Amino acid sequence: MHILKVLWDLIKRSQKIAVWVLSVVSVVFTFVPESVFATIKKWSFISQYIVGLLGDNLSIENINIIFNRLLLFAVVWFIFTVGQIVKLSFIKSVTIKGDDFIVEVKYGDILKEADCRRVIAFDECFTTVIGNAPNEIKTSSICGQYLQSNPDIDIPGLISSIHLTPDKRKSRYKHNIRYKSGTIVPNGNDLLLAFAPLDETGRGVFPSYKEYLDSLFYLWKELDKYYAQQDVSISILGSGITRIGDGMGSFISQQKLLDMIIESYKLSPYKIKKPHTLRIICRKDNDFSLNKIEAC
């Protein structure tokens, strides 16, 4: 499966490879005289055969030049293709740089990230009950794993310590107290995030893409307040069982969610100042590839 993904990504990059190859070959053709290509006579026997077929209008020297130029083109294409295959096979991270930000997207486990502030996404009510019911935190989720490794966490106490005011609007789930999606509550070096709105059954559902993006923009504003001159690590928010859209919504691929996260961060006036980095930690998945991200 990995080999097929690499080949598919290579096919999609073939246009870019062609541009690179044509650029290199054009430079060589511009500065290297034809006489150099004429001196390479490996094709003399073929040249003589072609001249015999087509007559004396073509010289052996001219045919040698044509073949040697084609050989150069093939060699350069081969080198660039092999280089891309190696890159696509072993890529583990992609860095995106702007005038005022650095984003690193990489495979990994956010709970193993070090030397940074980790953003751990909860729902809008900061639910801490772990289980398999729709309204409970799943043990396999990042939030579930975090709660299991921090069994004594006192989220109400953390909320009280920063004098955080609940949102005026109650949650759709049992009319519980909720916090604005994108709100951060510090827990030591970790940043607990109120994120997914809950529906009547307690499942995470963003009613629309707009609400999802609004939550991201508010998150960037909150990070500006709490990142404390450190790198910040986030997961691909909403990539678990959270849905986006009208009604029950639909599951969105990691790739699409990542695109929205990156674009919203680029557009936000609130960013983590250089040289510090926003790290986006991704899990390896069949519908996701770092090769689809344009580094710059």
What label would you give each PLM region?
Residues 2-296:
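Macrodomain-like recognition of ADP-ribose-binding/processing modules
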